[in-house]
């Protein structure tokens, strides 16, 4: 009876262990499902930002091609800029959160962790790529707007250098160059465009500054990942070198081994021949006696 009780207890313990393993597997599966859900959401956000960037580039072109752009076009651009910033912040926060969880689980090396690292790296690089394109579009728009201001100032008889123009933009006061413009119809139109372009640049620079810290944050993350990947690549290259070196050494060893074997066979043959000759001499000597 006592033995039977011990068997039942042992069986129960085994069942409990199995249950724990099932619970761990279920918990891990649920966690990875949640992780992939976040990955998909973040990827869609990045794709949406990419679409918005292309739309913004079109609006930049429209604004630059019109002497006095439509207010609606500028409003559309403002809404688009706000949407890009909102989505970009959301993506940045998601990536930072993923990075934190990965660092916390760094002590446990597992297939899941490698998958999470890989997915996080891919998304981070994609995000930086999209935001770099956006930054390039903004800088291009600023330079072309600045060029338009410079041309309009020339129309009014005021020639400015790039340094002087930058000074005006940094001061936020276009009156530095527009205060003495002659009161004529052409000058008024030029003045209106100068002031409008100046406002566009001021608004744009505000957006660039807001995105700068976030961009640098993610860019640094990707740079660190790049160093990690470079280290991995370097280790792989070293490993390949070691393998090639070992292969060459093995070939040389086999060659030397083959040569040594040939020498050994020759020596054996010579010894056998000598022994044969010696035996023949002894035999003849005995026969003569």
From Swiss-Prot:
Ranges for domain t-SNARE coiled-coil homology: 191-253
Residue stretches in coiled coil: 32-111
Compartment(s): Membrane
GO biological process terms held by the UniProt record: exocytic insertion of neurotransmitter receptor to postsynaptic membrane; exocytosis; intracellular protein transport; intracellular transport; long-term synaptic potentiation; membrane fusion; modulation of chemical synaptic transmission; neuron projection development
Tissue and organ distribution: Heart, spleen, lung and kidney.
Example of a GO MF term: SNAP receptor activity
Gene3D superfamilies recorded: 1.20.5.110, 1.20.58.70
Keywords linked to the UniProt accession: Coiled coil, Membrane, Neurotransmitter transport, Transmembrane, Transmembrane helix, Transport
GO cellular component terms, semicolon-separated: apical plasma membrane; azurophil granule; cell-cell junction; dendrite; endomembrane system; glutamatergic synapse; growth cone; lamellipodium
Protein name per the record: Syntaxin-3
SMART domains: SynN (SM00503), t_SNARE (SM00397)
UniProt cross-references to PROSITE patterns, sorted A to Z: SYNTAXIN (PS00914), T_SNARE (PS50192)
Family the entry assigns: Belongs to the syntaxin family.
Organism: Rattus norvegicus
Ranges in the topological domain labelled Extracellular: 285-289
Cytoplasmic topological domain: 1-263
Transmembrane segments: 264-284
Bilayer topology annotation: Single-pass type IV membrane protein
Function: Potentially involved in docking of synaptic vesicles at presynaptic active zones. Apical receptor involved in membrane fusion of apical vesicles. Essential for survival of retinal photoreceetors.
Domain of life: Eukaryota
Subunit structure: Interacts with REEP6. Interacts with PRPH2 in rod and cone photoreceptors. Interacts with ROM1. Interacts with SNAP25. Interacts with VAMP2.
Tagged with keyword Transmembrane: yes
Entry annotated with the keyword Membrane: yes
């Amino acid at each position: 009876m006592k033995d039977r009780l011990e068997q039942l207890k042992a069986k129960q313990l085994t069942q409990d262990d199995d249950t724990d393993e099932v619970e761990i597997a279920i918990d891990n599966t649920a966690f990875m499902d949640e992780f992939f859900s976040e990955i998909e959401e973040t990827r869609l956000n990045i794709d949406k930002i990419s679409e918005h960037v292309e739309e913004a580039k079109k609006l930049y072109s429209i604004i630059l091609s019109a002497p006095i752009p439509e207010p609606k076009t500028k409003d559309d651009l403002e809404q688009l800029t706000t949407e890009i910033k909102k989505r970009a912040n959301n993506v940045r926060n998601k990536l930072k959160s993923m990075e934190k969880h990965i660092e916390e689980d760094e002590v446990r090396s597992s297939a899941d962790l490698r998958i999470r690292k890989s997915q996080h790296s891919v998304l981070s690089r994609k995000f930086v790529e999209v935001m770099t394109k956006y930054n390039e579009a903004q800088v291009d728009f600023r330079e072309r707007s600045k060029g338009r201001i410079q041309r309009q100032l020339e129309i009014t008889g005021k020639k400015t250098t790039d340094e002087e123009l930058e000074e005006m933009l940094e001061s936020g006061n276009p009156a530095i160059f527009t205060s003495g413009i002659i009161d004529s119809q052409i000058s008024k139109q030029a003045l209106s465009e100068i002031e409008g372009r100046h406002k566009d640049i001021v608004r744009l620079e505000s957006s660039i500054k807001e995105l700068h810290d976030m961009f640098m944050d993610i860019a640094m993350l990707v740079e660190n990942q790049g160093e990690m990947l470079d280290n991995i690549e370097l280790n792989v290259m070293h490993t390949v070198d070691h393998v090639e070196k070992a292969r060459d050494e093995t070939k040389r060893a086999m060659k030397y081994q083959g040569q040594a074997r040939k020498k050994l066979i020759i020596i054996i043959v010579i010894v056998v021949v000598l022994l044969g000759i010696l035996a023949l001499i002894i035999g003849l000597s005995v026969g003569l006696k």
